[in-house]
Amino acid sequence: MRDRNRGVIRPLSLRGAGRGTAAAMGLSAALIAGGAQAQDANGEDEVVLDTLQIEDATADVNPNAQPGVPYKARTSGDLHRVKPLSETPQTIQVLTEQQLEEQGATDLRDVLDNVPGVTIGTGENGNAFGDRYIIRGHEARSDVFVDGLRDPGMTTRETFAVDQIEITKGPSSSFAGRGSTGGAVNSITKKASTDYQFTRVDAGIGTDDYYRVTLDANVPLTDTLALRANLLYGYEEVPNRNFSDRERYGAAVSAAFKPSEVFELVLDYYHLTANDAPDLGGYVPRPTGTGPDDVTVYEPWDDVPNYTQNGDFLDSDVDTVTGRIYITPFDGFTIVNSTRYGETSNGYVLTGLRGGAYDPATDTYAPVTLSTHQGNQEVEYFVNQFNVLGEFATGAVLHNLILGAEYSNLQVANGTYDLTANGATNCVTAGRGGLSPNYCITDENRNVIFGENEIHSIVQRTIADGSVDSDWQVETLSVYAMDTVDFTDWLSVHGGIRMDAFSYSNVVTSRGTVTPYTYSDALWNGHAGIGVKPLEEVYVYFNYGTAKNINGGESDLGGNCGYGGICVDDGTGIGDGSSESSESFELGVKADLFDDRFLLTAAAFQITKGDVFESAGDGYSAGGSLNTGENRVRGLEFGLVGNITPQLLAQAALTVMDSEITDSNDPDKIGRRLSNFANTQFSGQLRYQVTDAIAFGGTATYKSAQYTGQPDDAASYDSNLDIFTYRVPDYWTFDAFASVDFNQNFGARVNVTNIGNEDYYVSGYRSGHFLYKGDERRATLTLTGKF
């Protein structure tokens, strides 16, 4: 397939000598204005000239961008993806920097919550709080990458230093390594370049004490050396949830040294401090009734006050250093070596809800009590990745070959805090250990019994550092090879294979007993497929891919088998089971229209995950059964992105999926749907350019109902009532923005998120005790200066 996209097939063509041209073509703060000639066959030169005129006044220099189409990325930032996205045989949704700005989203969790096919998971005492994502029904909290290298641990992730965010859907282990059953998330960060000079400052204020200031500056020091700095400070209260807030400090510094066309060195440092006092939201009572024909289902308690306690926190710190060397020994071949060292920490003490069940016999509710969720995690990791990328011909056949090796050492210490509750209890409730004193915030009629201020000082905890209860480490050596072969301009095949040899260690301490778990194994994964271009603008593909998940592969857990921690069958040893295995089939079509400015996509897919580890009991112990479960997800995904008209820009995606447990050690689970799984999701974003200086638009998001449960397991179910137990309702949300450029250097943007002030929940804890509450309406004003 060597036609109009020939220029981007070359490995690193947008990172090496060609990077300046690609960046210059994409420069504009009002790219839609340049896009007004997008469909004018005679206007191509005018677009380039127009953007070049304001090169020094802009910070939109993403080398992967589609010139003149700010919502559309032309290529992936992952060097293993050698084709343009319109000819990549997999569903990959890309969110550009301008999309994120106009959505008004800044944390990665909020960004991904708007992506169809992705849902958000909760933390609790079985798995850690932090960013948790579920892609096409499968856990992806360990499948997060930055510039193609794994970003381990449970932390808060920001977008202030990001060019674009890529969500790959479907098993990707030949690209990503272990995990990635449902897909992976890859953030492409901003890099220094000698090809341009700019400074951009954004300062925002808004309702609920919203303040946010960012700086993005790129300075060429010489013809061969450049520096780029991104700085962040942000603070906001959670809308209409007084007492809960979020604060961010960030810095990202990049240096690029390119003394010749055959050698380049890029060094990056990244830091983020995130300090939150989270609000865990409401709760949903368990259904009541006498049988399947007499069932009452309850909606979440909408009027729950903010019950966050004094001293509650969710704090994350991230520090990483990355070095990359690019060597082009001769035309068509590039050697890339990437090294990263990182340290992250994530600690939290949070307050949730418990109880509140309704008793139809007395027409009363059980008191709602407060619960504590706590833990901390210290992560240290090192990774080195070596790639050889070659473009060459064997006769009339063109190859894009990648050979690679990777070494990684991930170490995670999970621990707890020592907590003492000093506040006076005010009720007695029944639990597993019988009756015990407790902290109740409601009476039998669900009336809150504390005032707005005193409710935050009920428990009065003192917090001290505790002990480590899980010392987790995985050391991995990987080798891989993949090739994309163009036989003709209309026919190509692609394939790859990867081997990950790993050594696993996890020393778990539970109630004074220390248990070491160790084993080693090797994972083999691959992908293969075919692509056909019946028309120049249309690409039809079929793709097959596999993925593997290792026993105990989730780093935030010890011996909690039901949450991705280590599982041990009493009759076998830890290493006697196979890794969980997944395979995916995807049939898709992509049409890149209007001179590559408008992309339509459609895909049908099926993911089957087998050899699933299943827990015994409540999932908080290592006891379980090895390789007894299986589940399946089938679905359709449709997407569009680009310029519909010269003035109207859009991105939209729709997923329609179905999930089912097809085999289990527990026969009652067979036939049920997966937990935390939304059958239907939609997101659409529009931008209309009224004049060269004025634009407005908005976003609409829909997510169908979900049902809570343990990760990668059947949703919680009441067999007596024949109903799923805890339902997270479906919802629509709408956002809007308007922007104006006062001149070439100054502009302003207004964002209003959740315009209708919808009361909605993004996910729920498996027993319904708390539901993550979505933010209520917020309005912000951002002033931008470009120099």
Question: What is each model feature region?
Answer:
Residues 23, 50-196, 587:
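Acidic, small-polar-rich N-terminal luminal/periplasmic segments of exported/outer-membrane proteins
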Residues 256-260, 379, 398-410, 417, ...:
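Structural signature of Gram-negative outer-membrane beta-barrels, strongest in the C-terminal barrel
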Residues 704-712, 739-787:
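C-terminal beta-signal and adjacent terminal beta-strands/loops
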Residues 326-328, 332-340, 344-352, 576-661, ...:
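Membrane-embedded beta-barrel scaffold of Gram-negative outer-membrane proteins
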Residues 234-239, 247, 251-258, 262-328, ...:
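Acidic/polar loop-and-plug regions of large Gram-negative outer-membrane beta-barrel proteins
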Residues 161-163, 174-251, 259-263, 319, ...:
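Outer-membrane beta-barrel translocator/receptor signature
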Residues 321, 326-342, 372-507:
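Face-selective signature of the C-terminal outer-membrane beta-barrel domain
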Residues 489, 603-608, 626-715, 756-757, ...:
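Gram-negative outer-membrane beta-barrel transporters
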